[in-house]
Amino acid sequence: MVVTLGYWDIRGLAHAIRLLLEYTETPYQERRYKAGPAPDFDPSDWTNEKEKLGLDFPNLPYLIDGDVKLTQSNAILRYIARKHNMCGETEVEKQRVDVLENHLMDLRMAFARLCYSPDFEKLKPAYLEQLPGKLRQLSRFLGSRSWFVGDKLTFVDFLAYDVLDQQRMFVPDCPELQGNLSQFLQRFEALEKISAYMRSGRFMKAPIFWYTALWNNKKE
């Protein structure tokens, strides 16, 4: 059965989901909702449908898989991952998954708040000042492992790739994105299914954010 992923026509919160669908070879189709032109960016392409899909909490992204209808990006990731035993196996692995999942969301939201803020240029120096420390924490958490939980991929690696790739785009010369974090990014991009997806016309690297953001709000 083909699942349907619904989201705006941007990278955003759907990026890790798309990567996981591709990696697991899950048959899927996308409903990419488009905003109207500036300055209003009319969202009616989505709002006209949102109450008609049978979602408990109508929002984007959503995933429809037969009778299963989910919103919340991490709930969607976990649903896909459970089908493929990618949520950690031991209790310690599951703990690492849970901690990193929530920590990465904190990092993602802090970056989004910066990029959507009208004071972007004023706030950017403080963000850049604290970023190296955050990346060093992730580097220590990864350690010498191949993946963030151990030797086997879990869904948090897809989240981590997305978050780290955004920072790499934002600060290309960041020293803290070298070493094991750089190796992690390269290792992830070298995965056969991921590499093929990134070379395909389906892949969307940008825009990361909605059109009102002050950074990375346009297609490349």
Swiss-Prot record:
Effect of R108L: Reduced catalytic activity
GO molecular function terms attached to this record: glutathione transferase activity; identical protein binding
Binding of glutathione, residues: Y7, W8, P43, S44, D45, W46, K50, N59, L60, Q72, S73
SUPFAM superfamilies linked to this entry: GST C-terminal domain-like, Thioredoxin-like
Catalytic activity: RX + glutathione = an S-substituted glutathione + a halide anion + H(+)
Gene Ontology CC entries for this record: cytoplasm
Pfam families: GST_C, GST_N
Domain GST N-terminal: 2-88
UniProt keyword annotations, A-Z: Cytoplasm, Lipid metabolism, Transferase
PROSITE patterns: GST_CTER, GST_NTER
Compartments, as annotated in UniProt: Cytoplasm
The keyword Lipid metabolism is annotated on this UniProt entry: yes
Domain of life per record: Eukaryota
Family, similarity comment: Belongs to the GST superfamily. Mu family.
Summary of the function given for this chain in its UniProt record: Conjugation of reduced glutathione to a wide number of exogenous and endogenous hydrophobic electrophiles. Participates in the formation of novel hepoxilin regioisomers.
Protein's name in the database: Glutathione S-transferase 2
Gene source species: Gallus gallus (Chicken)
Gene designation per UniProt: GSTM2
